[in-house]
């Protein structure tokens, strides 16, 4: 069977634009999409699972529509990151009220387990723009400064973000899990 891309979005404007360029997009969420069982090789949640009301049920639905041995990919803000600890309430990825849930390595592993997946791999990374966005919030609201980041700080932040990501403390959590065969 040739590769098939199917998308689901709860944003009507995004759905309309995607459909206008020929993409196969359904409006709604995974729980209401009605995909057939054992159909997909991969289900990808890219910064979306933290927005759903029932992440366990959503992942259970992903498991249902995956073929045996199929994989689920999660890309999530990492509440256990050095960024979250450093910036506290000013970490940009808390993003209330849009983010209904926050995950770290342990809670994402538990979530995947509750949904019936077997964890394969978890890593982290940090983007310089996310890190500097948090720094901007901190300086503006806590330090009461409109300080802009110079090129030296941007380069230092870039190197720091790479190191934090490789050490497992990055601001983005990347988890891969498999539906048992």
Predicted features along the sequence, with ranges:
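Generic alpha-helical propensity signal that fires on short helical segments
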Residues: 90-94, 104, 112, 135-140, ...
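Generic, low-specificity signal for short hydrophobic/alpha-helical stretches with a mild N-terminal bias
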Residues: 44, 85, 90-94, 145, ...
